[in-house]
């Protein structure tokens, strides 16, 4: 906990009134060896700077949440991380290999990506998830490919709808299909842009528990953007807060303070700890 904060007996972290500005040396280093490194990345649309000097890393077995208000570059950063957008400066490294020098197929073997909004094509749920095996198929599909898809469909509660067409299912169901497809890619790094945005609370909890299970079981690294601070605080290991296209702060759960939330989001909050998890409560 920073020296300008202390916890009262009510479990609420209270901030001293002086500024947080002098304490901006929040390091974005991740514990352990980073499997994915964002090294000095900058990106602009025409002359408008969206990302500047981004440095961040994520380790195997870790979930990193990218947080911040709308329009700060969270989704753009995720799209740079798998080369959908090419950074104008800096590099994205997976296992110290530069993604910009890889083919699309090689990138897909290393990085799985789920967009915030996914297009619904005319194919079945099963075939859509099966596409996740495409980077690994050398000649034809194997029994192992089919078994992996069937297992993933069962884990995500999609078995009963595997023969339905994905343009006929709900937005929340499509979201689960897309996450399921990314996981059967067996990537080293999983990138999830608002993975719970189209889901009700029950499904949000279910899919985040599944993501946590996949990360722990397969020892992959996951980076996800999220709007819901409390869900992020519950499921992620570390947090990067973005502001104005830059990383404003990087911390674990103990570094999430009322002062930091106010500086990033512009709202006054209390942060209480419940079962050793921080909970953000707007005032």
Regions found by a protein language model. Give the residues of each.
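ABC ATPase nucleotide-binding domains
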Residues: 2, 14-20, 258, 264-283
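Conserved ABC transporter NBD signature motif
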Residues: 90-98, 107
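The feature captures the beta-strand-to-loop junction immediately N-terminal to the Walker
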Residues: 67-69
